[in-house]
From Swiss-Prot:
GO biological process: division septum assembly; FtsZ-dependent cytokinesis
Organism: Shewanella sediminis (strain HAW-EB3)
UniProt subcellular location: Cell inner membrane
Protein name (Swiss-Prot/TrEMBL): Cell division protein ZipA
Polar residues composition bias: residue spans: 90-100
Periplasmic topological intervals: 1-6
Subunit details: Interacts with FtsZ via their C-terminal domains.
Protein family according to the UniProt entry: Belongs to the ZipA family.
Main function: Essential cell division protein that stabilizes the FtsZ protofilaments by cross-linking them and that serves as a cytoplasmic membrane anchor for the Z ring. Also required for the recruitment to the septal ring of downstream cell division proteins.
Length: 341
């Protein structure tokens, strides 16, 4: 076991040393070589020795020579400088212009005789001279130009206006006719006749009364808390004489068709005490003659009595408190026909 550990330790040390050596070798290889170590250095040295007796190499390129120029004096430097300052033009004569032209021709001829052996001449800067016009001469020329233009433009303008502007003849003033005021007819307001309210239909003295009774079962009473909702669902309305009435309109308006009262004296109801109210029965009655169709009114009263008996678990009786039957119904209808005939 100890020998195995020693072998592993030696192998690890060898691996570490190999990694370090390889790293240094890689870094050394990647570094750029200096000019002294470059293989092209000897090539350039050998090329310097292969030149002919005139100093040219195989490509015909000679050695670089540095020549010092002759010193330039201050006077020559001042003459070479270009004067950019504006100068006032002067008026030159024809003789001066001719001399300048001859001087230019001489310079051109001298340029043709130039050779390589001639020494370079100093450059002479020639100043350009422009004619100067005095203020008086300029003003006179301007005045003459204005006078000439004004004389030529004046007739043209006058003829232009004469040809373009037409002669306007005075137009006659339009005569305005003032219409005479027309008197509008005065409308007299005619008072509309007030609608005449229809006189209420006056019924004659009652000739007959049709009566129906709705009574509770034997030994029981009708409860006011159940009676009031049933009456309202049948379109009865509490009104005159503290009893309920059925009108022409289901909303409780119009003429009274028939009425409903308490069967127990005094025959009235108290709405504030309807929940505690109890009675043995109620009575429905219709007078003849009546408003509207009596047959229709009786049919509505009979249907309402049947509905109350069903809602309150009561019994329907005739005017003599006898159970309602078909013969009693035919008797009531005959009484209605008798009143209409």
């Amino acid at each position: 076991m100890e020998n195995l550990q020693l072998v592993l330790f030696v192998l690890g040390a060898i691996a570490i040393v190999a990694v370090l050596v390889h790293g240094f070798w890689s870094i050394r290889k990647q570094q750029p070589k200096s000019l002294k170590e470059s293989p092209m250095t000897g090539f350039y040295k050998d090329q310097g020795a292969t030149r002919d007796h005139q100093g040219f190499d195989a490509d015909g390129i000679g050695q670089v020579r540095v020549r010092k120029g002759s010193p330039i004096s201050d006077d020559e430097r001042a003459e070479d400088e270009i004067d950019f300052a504006p100068k006032e033009p002067t008026l030159t004569s024809e003789g001066q212009m001719d001399s300048s032209v001859r001087q230019d021709e001489n310079v051109a001829e001298a340029g043709d005789d130039f050779s390589l052996s001639d020494q370079p001449k100093q450059r002479v800067t020639r100043q350009r001279q422009e004619p100067v016009l005095s203020a008086e001469v300029q003003q006179e020329e301007i005045n003459q130009m204005e006078l000439g233009l004004g004389q030529e433009a004046a007739p043209n303008q006058s003829s232009l206006f004469e040809s373009t502007v037409p002669e306007l003849s005075p137009e006659p003033e339009p005569s305005i006719e003032v219409p005479e005021p027309v008197s509008e007819p005065v409308l007299e307001s005619v008072p509309e006749p007030e609608p005449v309210a229809p006189e209420p239909e006056v019924l004659p003295e009652p000739q007959d009364v049709l009566v129906l009774h709705v009574v509770a079962a034997e030994g029981e009473e009708l409860n006011g808390a159940e009676l009031l909702p049933s009456l309202l669902s049948l379109n009865f309305k509490f009104g005159d004489m503290s009893i309920f009435h059925r009108h022409e309109d289901n909303a409780g308006t119009g003429k009274t068709l028939f009425s409903l009262a308490n069967m127990v004296k005094p025959g009235v109801f108290n709405l504030d005490d309807m929940e505690q109210f109890t009675t043995e029965g109620v009575v429905l009655f219709m007078t003849l003659p009546c408003h509207g169709d009596p047959l229709r009114n009786f049919s509505i009263m009979l249907n309402s009595a049947h509905q109350l008996a069903d809602d309150l678990s009561g019994q329907l009786l005739d005017g003599g408190r006898v159970a309602w039957c078909e013969n009693t119904k035919q008797n009531y209808l005959q009484r209605i026909r008798t009143q209409n005939s």
